[in-house]
Amino acid sequence: MVPRAVSEASRPELHALVVEDSPMMRQLLVFALARVPGLRITEADDGVDALRKLAGQRFDIILTDINMPIMDGLKLVRRVRADAAHKDVPIVIVTTESAEEDRKRAMALGANAYVTKPIQAPRILEVVRELLKLES
């Protein structure tokens, strides 16, 4: 059975985790995601902060930068994929790293999508809606 798109108005609340060390970039992502009705957003400054938040909550999607202090986004992807409780949560990499080998590496580690900065709200929304199987 193929999953069908769900109307945003008729689905249960969804929860996104935005992991970005730059407060300005994090706010741009939050602003873009705020256009998805009923999407609750939690923010994290880096991979370690994200893992703390993942330990106590359920998330439906994770958006993460790669280049962050303490724990980068690729290490976060590895850790999330190794955790049985979160291994199937879609992960979107949002980064300035635009080389094809960077994208391939992230996807090989388990990312579901790779979006390069500068952040374009329509592109972020398209990817999130596709991964969450929401109607546009």
Q: Can you name each region flagged by the protein language model?
A:
Residues 27-35:
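Charged docking surfaces used in two-component/phosphorelay signaling
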Residues 68:
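Receiver (REC) domain active-site loop signature in two-component systems and cognate sites
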